[in-house]
Amino acid sequence: MNDVVKIVEDFIKPHIPKPFELFAVEWEKFGGDMMLSILVDKEGGIEIDETAELSELISPLLDTISPDPFPTEGYLLEVASPGAERPLRKAEHFAGAVGEYIFVKLYQKINNEKEFTGDLVSFDGETLVVDVLDKTRHKNIEIPLSAVAKAQTMVKF
């Protein structure tokens, strides 16, 4: 996790009002600018007008972080829902995604594969068990959380 993400996450988390929760903070290049994406959610999903209200709350808060972690040339702010295909970055994200269809990309191969798509059967805090389709058979693949480079929920068609 980079410094801006950690600083922003630690700073704004206590300011997010109930029933909302801070899902993730992302700091990425977007065209020629830097984009700070603050992903918020709530039980049952979040509405667009709620993200607008949260943006009005969060934007001035970010200006009070000291020392200022942002580049002098500024950045773009986005407050949004994690969406249907939401990123899975923390242990609690994986725990909440048990039973869902996911995509996982690994740092190193397991069973000669670096990417898996399937149902997340279980997660014990350290290991994911993913039910993947191997040709015509289903099989469970155990993936250590430490081996996961990227993961997200997927919409299954």
UniProtKB/Swiss-Prot annotation:
Q: What does this protein do?
A: Required for maturation of 30S ribosomal subunits.
Provide the coiled-coil residue spans.
Answer: none
Tell where it localizes. Cytoplasm
The record's SUPFAM superfamilies line, in alphabetical order, gives: YhbC-like, C-terminal domain (SSF74942), YhbC-like, N-terminal domain (SSF75420)
Identify the gene encoding this protein: rimP
Keyword terms of this UniProt record: Cytoplasm, Ribosome biogenesis
Family designation: Belongs to the RimP family.
Spell out the GO cellular component terms annotated for this protein, sorted alphabetically and separated by semicolons. cytosol
Task: Return any one Pfam family short name.
Answer: DUF150_C
What residues form the membrane-spanning segments?
A: none
- Biological-process GO terms, alphabetical: ribosomal small subunit assembly; translation
Classify the main location.
Answer: cytoplasm
Superkingdom classification of source: Bacteria
What is the protein's name according to its record?
Ribosome maturation factor RimP
